[in-house]
Amino acid sequence: MLIKLLTKVFGSRNDRTLRRMRKVVNIINAMEPEMEKLSDEELKGKTAEFRARLEKGEVLENLIPEAFAVVREASKRVFGMRHFDVQLLGGMVLNERCIAEMRTGEGKTLTATLPAYLNALTGKGVHVVTVNDYLAQRDAENNRPLFEFLGLTVGINLPGMPAPAKREAYAADITYGTNNEYGFDYLRDNMAFSPEERVQRKLHYALVDEVDSILIDEARTPLIISGPAEDSSEMYKRVNKIIPHLIRQEKEDSETFQGEGHFSVDEKSRQVNLTERGLVLIEELLVKEGIMDEGESLYSPANIMLMHHVTAALRAHALFTRDVDYIVKDGEVIIVDEHTGRTMQGRRWSDGLHQAVEAKEGVQIQNENQTLASITFQNYFRLYEKLAGMTGTADTEAFEFSSIYKLDTVVVPTNRPMIRKDLPDLVYMTEAEKIQAIIEDIKERTAKGQPVLVGTISIEKSELVSNELTKAGIKHNVLNAKFHANEAAIVAQAGYPAAVTIATNMAGRGTDIVLGGSWQAEVAALENPTAEQIEKIKADWQVRHDAVLEAGGLHIIGTERHESRRIDNQLRGRSGRQGDAGSSRFYLSMEDALMRIFASDRVSGMMRKLGMKPGEAIEHPWVTKAIANAQRKVESRNFDIRKQLLEYDDVANDQRRAIYSQRNELLDVSDVSETINSIREDVFKATIDAYIPPQSLEEMWDIPGLQERLKNDFDLDLPIAEWLDKEPELHEETLRERILAQSIEVYQRKEEVVGAEMMRHFEKGVMLQTLDSLWKEHLAAMDYLRQGIHLRGYAQKDPKQEYKRESFSMFAAMLESLKYEVISTLSKVQVRMPEEVEELEQQRRMEAERLAQMQQLSHQDDDSAAAAALAAQTGERKVGRNDPCPCGSGKKYKQCHGRLQ
């Protein structure tokens, strides 16, 4: 109560921010007559003038009124469009490292031109981030004339572009691209073998469109570049045959419940659990198929890979549904994004799940992957000096934006008041009753010429509604992942009188639904339209537009509530743009996933008490409140998961930044000999210490062991025992110096043969390759550690602290291994003539290119964190702890690569 009173007196923080910014808007408006007097050349010349002022030390913020006034005037001349005052407010919010919540249809694309222009004046580059390639290309092409009129360059960063084209796009003042492509380019740059292979500049200012989709919905899914691991496709096929024999039971076995099935599914956490009966049956079937020996246990260490295959196959059959989670197209399993309903070509689930789904669908099984580099969007976007974003729905997630990204949310007022009617939810007992009610509503609306947009949460549901509409004889368009190419065209015409459009989730985001349909699309369809034709099309459109407004505007139907209120609000936001009339209603049933998992008992009890008849719906504020509470539960759970993921990834992030910064320094220098000399001293000191402990008696020295180690690891054949026999006065310090001097001498002789330049080139190559190889192993080990770290909780230890402690010691061990392997490799190298070295280098480059082509981009969910990490680890674990390490170092496995585990 007190807070409400204070807010009334002083205004909310949002009100105070807008009040302050409105003063600047008044200054910009006052400059308009002055700007109108300028010629095109003078207006364009303002860009050079602003840049000169910045170079002299003027602060960017001081340029806001003039810069915004220049962009507004240029937009009037180039597009015939003048920025509204609320768009100027939005532009200022975006410049202040904030998130601007602007309703659908308020012109976010035009608003973005203001902060993009202002921040491009610094010459450090602006990245405009969109959710898909179509929007990146559309926005870049639409805004290019404006930016080029003002003397700025525009680049587009698309997947599959060659490196020179990407470099050119990044060198532009303003670059448009998707979040995935920016992230993957960052990872690829940090895997480059020469400075010329890198494409990105230093990350300066990111302006993220649909910021909620990118920074929240996709935050749980790291970007991964992976290379192929060993082939185990045959095993997936064999295990896949067994799974259909298992029967699902409703819930997990407990003291009070014993089911008859073989596995249960936890829909909340999307996990599958085998029962005791299921385990016994699986083991029997594996023995029968000849996959496992009689008397063996599936849980024995020898069968850990088999357990991995069984778990993946079980999840593929029980949790992943065709046309909901993925589609099969041209013999390939393609993931469907749960948030947007779009297909994600080239993305693959990890942990063997994708292969298990391929086996289930009977398509060709592709190899498993091993992680080469990965980063989460949360950590990628926090690398920018300045970050801002815009969306139609951010206020519900304001706390998360603030706590994770340190971004405040400012709600920008609409240009015209919103008059859309949001009708209360209707809840039915069954799915069939709900669908029937939706069909009746559509019939009623279209009969009076009102366009209808039906939002569904999966391809399967959109096809179900489509079939029912076809049976009822209602013409309609379907917009889902399967019809991706027609997306913008279908959305543009969804406002046609009596048009019915079915869309999965937020497919078509970024394209406005214009009441009466899009007259621009009709003009674009004509080859050479005359002025008369265009006028006629516009006149016809005006008649249709008025008719649709008269009928009540666009009507939105939600076929079920999404887990997130924000996505429901996005669907509603497609209607009522720029003060247009419109309406919306959600239809629910007790069989919907959200109701079944989170709100069932209370609401179904209420419905039974009311004695509802088939086909009747309940419409009550209590029900709406119960559903909102269910959504809040899911949202807070998802927030906890994202926060947890970030806390763990922050540990890896510190290490990633250290490694990438080291790697970039290496790439930028041509001579690393000083570093090599310093490392050599450290390595030889540590090696000698193992056999001649410092300040020890000669009786404690292991000279034969030292000689053998130097021979095996550094190709140094030194007669140390002879030296000691012939020179009794040779003490420890002198001996150490002599061994190091001998190693340097041998190395210098090699350098004389091949030449200093070639040796420097070779040293750099060895350091980069060794670093990449060890970093890849370290990532797999970190994934493996992460998978089991929660078990430390049972020992009363904090898993996060344990993860930090262990990962740090693993990182330190990796850096030690790096030094050792670099010196060992350089010492063992057999010198050849320069021509031979060049030939070998050429072969290495070809091999690196081949590997790059084989690399696949995969996008993994947080609960499957290690791409084939188990495969990598168990392959290593077959070596005994006390056996010699397979890398050939001569050390025991536990003292060499075994340390990573």
UniProtKB/Swiss-Prot annotation:
Belongs to the SecA family. CDD domains: DEXDc_SecA, SF2_C_secA. It catalyses: ATP + H2O + cellular proteinSide 1 = ADP + phosphate + cellular proteinSide 2. Residues 859-901 are annotated as: Disordered. This is Protein translocase subunit SecA. GO terms for cellular component: cell envelope Sec protein transport complex; cytoplasm; cytoplasmic side of plasma membrane; plasma membrane. Induction: Repressed under conditions of excess protein secretion capacity and derepressed when protein secretion becomes limiting. This is regulated by SecM. It is a peripheral membrane protein. Monomer and homodimer; probably dimeric in the cytoplasm. It is not yet clear whether the form that functions in protein insertion is monomeric or dimeric. Part of the essential protein translocation apparatus which comprises SecA, SecYEG and auxiliary proteins SecDF-YajC and YidC. Makes direct contact with SecY. ATP binds at residues 87, 105-109, 512. Zn(2+) binds at residues 885, 887, 896-897. GO terms for molecular function: ATP binding; identical protein binding; preprotein binding; protein-exporting ATPase activity; ribonucleoprotein complex binding; ribosome binding; zinc ion binding. Keywords: ATP-binding, Cell inner membrane, Cell membrane, Cytoplasm, Membrane, Metal-binding, Nucleotide-binding, Protein transport, Translocase, Translocation, Transport, Zinc. It comes from Escherichia coli (strain K12). InterPro entries: Helicase_ATP-bd, Helicase_C-like, P-loop_NTPase, SEC_C_motif, SecA, SecA_CS, SecA_DEAD, SecA_motor_DEAD. The lineage of its organism: Bacteria, Pseudomonadati, Pseudomonadota, Gammaproteobacteria, Enterobacterales.
